[in-house]
Amino acid sequence: IQDHILFAREGCYVSGSRGIITEMLTRKVLSGEITSLTPLMRGVRNSNNAIRIPLMAFLYRTLGPTRFVKGCNMAFWRNDLIRVNGYDESFCGWGREDSELAIRLDNSGVRQRCMKFRGVVFHLHHGKCERNSLSANEERYQQTIREHRTRCEIGLTRHLGETDQTRTPEPEVKIPVPASAGH
């Protein structure tokens, strides 16, 4: 959470990567047997995505944004998410919904801040989602790119009251950023 706060900037969303943990390690975490994870533990996959190296994060961030976003490690400003109407709920099953949201954010002027090597999260093991709709999801994603879409039709506004959709932004809150934040 601290890394997300350090990377938070108005007009930007933050995306990071994740380590993946096995079914056995997930059971131990959920039972409380293990309360802290490290990249080199047995049962951690994608360990290169679970390493926290602040200097590398700074260097990687300067290389520019990536389209490979992971919804399990993203953060947005509320008003930016409302502007693009949140996740497109017409996506079915697994695949491309996170990337499609990132495209709409980018198209609407909200820039990505890559947080690789910071903001480490671990993805708990779960059953595989059906991927029968992957080709339809890919087409929806490509259509958003082609048409330079900034909003989806079926999204967040279905769940918000009218005042939530049109309210003025909250007063600006300044988040103190330590001098050592690496920006």
What are these regions (language model features)?
Residues 25-29, 126-127, 133-136:
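Short aromatic-enriched loop/helix-cap "lid" or pocket-rim segments at secondary-structure transitions
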Residues 3, 84, 124:
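Residues that scaffold the ATP/ADP-binding catalytic core of kinase and kinase-like folds
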Residues 72, 107-111, 133-183:
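Terminal low-complexity segments of carbohydrate-biosynthetic enzymes
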Residues 73-85, 91-111, 116-117:
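A short, conserved alpha-helix in the catalytic core of glycosyltransferases
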